[in-house]
Structures are given as C-alpha cells and as structure tokens.
C-alpha cells in the first residue's frame, strides 16, 4: 500500500475501520471462534480501509453499498489466500440485508463486485 494502515488490537467485541485516524481496530483473537473468523473479520475491515483518500478514495458510496463492497472483498481475500472461513450461512445472512438496495438498482451488484475486486487486489498486494 502507498500508505500503511495502523492496526490496533484491543479488548472489546467490535471490529471497525476508523477513517478519521485511518486505523483498523480489532478485538483480541480470543473473541473469535477460530483463526479463520478472525482473519476474515480483519479482511473485511482492511477492505473498508481501502476507501481512504490515499488509497481507492471510495467515499461516495452509501453505507449499505460500502458494507457490500467490504463483505464481497473479504470473501475474495479469504478465497485467494485459502483462508477457509466460508461460513456461507453467515455471509448469506449478512448479504441478504442489502437485498432491498440491489432490487432498487441491480447494477449496484456489478459495480460493487468491481470495487471489491480492486480493494482485494490492493489489500493482497496485487495492484
């Protein structure tokens, strides 16, 4: 990455990307059911970090579309790195919450897939 992302590992049960300080905050490993779940959560937040103006500058998206990009991107990262966190029921339930947005504009799915692929490439270092 052109600009490294700061990662804070701390207590609590919530992972998130804080754009104002450009950092990923993630709970300690023991808060997750396994290593794969921990890594998948980190991948999700790493995709969020690519929206920063010093990376892919994706600040024009709605919250729902940004979450869709992050979830799809995390799936791509895990798949490419052979992280077997394919909890498809969890992914499906999470993605299902964005169905109303997709019904209102089906092109959003394809736009989101393209953005998530770019983000995954950046996180992995293939861009």
Task: Give short role names for the model-derived ranges.
Residues 34, 38, 42, 87, ...:
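Short, contiguous, pocket-lining structural segments
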Residues 1-39, 49-53:
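Active-site scaffold of zinc-dependent metalloenzymes
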Residues 36, 52-71, 87-95:
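Post-HEXXH active-site segment of zinc metalloproteases
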Residues 75-127:
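Long, well-structured alpha-helical subdomains associated
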Residues 27-30, 55-59, 98, 102:
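Glycine- and acidic
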Residues 42-50, 69, 73:
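Active-site His/Glu-centered metal-binding helix of metallohydrolases
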Residues 10-11, 58, 65, 83, ...:
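A hydrophobic alpha-helical transmembrane-helix feature that marks the membrane cores
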Residues 48, 52-56, 83, 125:
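Conserved helix-loop functional segments at active or binding sites
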């Amino acid at each position: 990455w052109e600009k490294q992302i700061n990662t804070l590992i701390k207590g609590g049960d919530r992972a998130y990307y804080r754009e104002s300080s450009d950092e990923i905050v993630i709970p300690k490993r023991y808060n997750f059911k396994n290593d794969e779940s921990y890594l998948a959560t980190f991948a999700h937040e790493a995709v969020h970090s690519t929206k920063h103006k010093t990376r892919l500058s994706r600040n024009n998206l709605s919250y729902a579309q940004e979450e869709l990009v992050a979830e799809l991107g995390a799936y791509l990262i895990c798949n490419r790195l052979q992280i077997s966190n394919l909890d498809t029921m969890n992914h499906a339930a999470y993605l299902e919450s964005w169905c109303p947005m997709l019904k209102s504009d089906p092109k959003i799915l394809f736009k989101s897939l393209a953005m998530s692929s770019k983000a995954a490439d950046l996180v992995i270092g293939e861009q």
